[in-house]
C-alpha cells in the first residue's frame, strides 16, 4: 500500500469515474493516510451527443455513483466541467484522424490532455500533491537514475500501462496508482466489504462518447456531414464493389464489407481523397516496420542507439520482439522480428523492456 510519510496529511485528488476501480483507489489512499478529495470530470453533454445519460462514461449515473462512494467515505467531492476542452482536444481530433484515414485512440488522448493535465493543474492549484486513478499499472522511481518509471500492473489481464505511455516525468512524480499491485478480483472484494454501490458494476468497454460503437454515425451526427459511398478496389485498382464511405472501415476489417469474392478479403488500405478502400487477402495485412511520431520516452531521456524491445501496436496485444531505431526528433523506427498483422496509423505503439515501459508514440506509417 502507498503510505503517507509525513505528519501533515498530503493531499490526493482522486479521479473518480463512478466505477469500482477508482472507488477502491480512493479508499486505499484514505486508509494510507492521505487527505482525499474526489473529482469527477464532466466530459460530454449527453443531449449534445444524442446519447442516454445512463450509457456513457462520466454520465449522470456515474456521477451519482461516485458521489455516493465519496459520501460513504466522508471525503469532499466535486464535478469539474471540461466539456469544451474535451470537445476540442478529444472529439474533434478523433474525427480529424478518421477523416485522414487513421484509426484514433481517444482514451490515450484523454489521459494525456485531460486526466493527467487538467487534473494535475487543478490539484496543484488547490494544494494537493497527487492525482490518483484506478489504472492497473505501477509508478516507481529508479534509485540509480532518479527517473520515474511506468511499469505494468501485476494483473496481466487488466494491465493498462499501454494507455499511460505518454505520461511525462513531471506528471509521473505526482501520480499514484494504488491498484497496480492488485488483481481485479481483490479490488471487487474490497469494494464489497466496504459496501460500495458499484462493487459489481461492469467495466466500461467502448469509447465513452460512442457507447454503441457506431463511430461513423456519431461523426455524421456531430459534424452534420454525410460520408459518401465509393469504390472497393482490389490490389490492381480494379473496382470490386461499392462501400458506404471510407471512414466507416478500418485496416484489417473483414466483417461488414458485403463483398462476395470467392475467398475472405480484408481492408488493406484507404485513399481518403479518392474515397476508395482497397481489399485483399489477409497476407496483405502484414508489415514488419512501423514509423512513429509524437514520441514520449519514460525510462530513458532519449533514444540515441538501437535497442532491443518488445512492443504492442494494440491495447491487449501480446508483446512482440523488435528493435527500435532513432529516426529524428520525436520519432522512431521499429523493426519487428516477425511481420505483424495490421499495425494501423493513428494507433499507439508502446515499447517495453521487461515490465518497464520504455516509451511509445503514434503510428504514422508502416511497410
What are these regions (language model features)?
Residues 20, 132-367:
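AMP-forming adenylation/ATP pyrophosphatase catalytic core
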